[in-house]
Amino acid sequence: MKAIYKYLVLPIILGMGVFTTVSCEKLETTNEDPNNPVEVPSNMLMSGTQKRMMDNVYDNWFGARQCLTYSQYWAQRNYTEEDRYQIRESVNNGYFNIFYRCLYCMDRLIELNTDPTKATISAVYGNNKNQIAAAKIMKVWMLSIITDTWGNVPYTEAGKLTKDVYYAKYDNQKDIYAAMIKELTEASQMINVKEKAFTGGDIIYKGDASKWKKFANSLRCRLAIHLSKVDSNWKTYIAEALKDGVFESNADNAVFKYSTTGQEYCMFYSGYYVSGRNDFTITRPFMDILKGQADTLNKKSHPWAGVVDPRLTVYTTPRIKEEKKGNVVVRTDTLYIGIPFGIPSGNNMFSTFRNMAPNWYANPPIQLTQDFTVPIMTYADLQFILSEYKGFSADEYKEGVRASVTYWTTLNGKPISTANLDAYVDAVSKKVDAEAVALQKYIDLFMNGTEAWVEIRRTGYPDQLIRPGEISAIGKDGAVLKFEPLSDTKGLIIPRVKYPTNESTLNGANFNAAVSKLEGGTNNYYSKMYWDVRTGPYDHPANK
């Protein structure tokens, strides 16, 4: 435990500014007790870093207050500042730092399997090349979240203290994407599927090298589709990944299952029941999508009007209503009403809307269970990517819908019947086009807020989400309540997160150079990602 603490908790110098005066190399010489080795075994480093990644990407801060609200799955019940794009600087600084620590740990795992003085020991825990490949894959997954949140970020010079790089430059996002696809290609090609990746410590795939290979190539497809509006080679990247082997069913899903053991709870659960807070509920826009309802306030239609999604009762519980009839209290649980998105928490109607929405603390859905399985990337996600790759093909689209509904209803312990699944697939497949694929992908990506937010920015869908300036609700007095962000996003669902303020002092010159490349030369929320070419809130750019 001491060793894991060293890598995952103690501050690490990342080459982006000095966070501490003690290096990891010096820490390694502070304890020579053979019964308490300072060197972390590679299997423990993998398990510890996997958990740290999941704990911070799928949590009630970066995960819930940012990505899940940016994607309008969740909204806050108490303080709605983050819903309205006012981000706490301490949180922004903290997650930027934590995510880079995770990258460092994967670099360290690679070193443990390449350094001749350490590789022999690491081989006890799995094939060296397979361990390296798994570390590369996890590093790319984490890096993709970093760059898709902030844009241009340190990469090639990050974590290079031993090479006397104390302040890392910010790489262009275009170059980072090219590097990530290259890393995944190399990872896939070095995997020996006949040998274990890890004999223990791999929470995601239990050491199954064949599944790591499929994940590497499926993730290549995801990154390639991100580039569909800006890189004419995106189809080539996918074709090459398909040749190397991708997910074939839900059995290949990259997921992280938490435990019911004390400190191993899912962070969504901990944020509610360990911390004793009741902070979130489902949004009205997402609830309307699931219920097949049009947005009458903003005159937006629904492509599957009247079709209730079978995942509705998985993703949320209803609001429990109690009514007294005579001397008997009758409870009804059929009220599925989402909370209006982006209303100021100080508005005198806010408590009314909150009390109409589901109370997840009292009646928790599956994502608030102790051992919830968080989705990293799924077979359904891949099928929607392949549908788009094939010109929005119906076969892959339908397979994606089937896989998603089957996965979520099975995870919830109530698998959908074949007849009901067939009926739903038929109802949502009358017209398969860019909107249908994007909307079903959005529904599937619930709880994967980072990827859903990417897709919203890349495609401009779903149209049903509330844009700045649109009507969120109308009060009983007829007052119109609009979604009015606290930060300027030029009328768009938030395109990026500002660079953390710590970077301006710890890595000032490189920070300033990065800011100068943003729109208007300021550290803002409205500068777009390299792959985001939308020209307006309802623009749906064509693929190259």
Residue locations for each model-derived region?
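Conserved, well-structured interaction surfaces
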Residues: 74-154, 160-199, 369-372
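Bacterial Sec-dependent N-terminal signal peptides
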Residues: 1-32
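Long, intrinsically disordered, low-complexity segments
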Residues: 23, 266-306, 312, 423-544
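Membrane-proximal, proline-rich intrinsically disordered regions
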Residues: 24-72, 76-85, 97-100, 108, ...
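Hydrophobic-face positions in mid-chain alpha helices that act as interaction patches
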Residues: 234-386, 390-444, 448-450, 459
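Internal, well-ordered domain-core segments that constitute the primary functional module
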Residues: 178-249
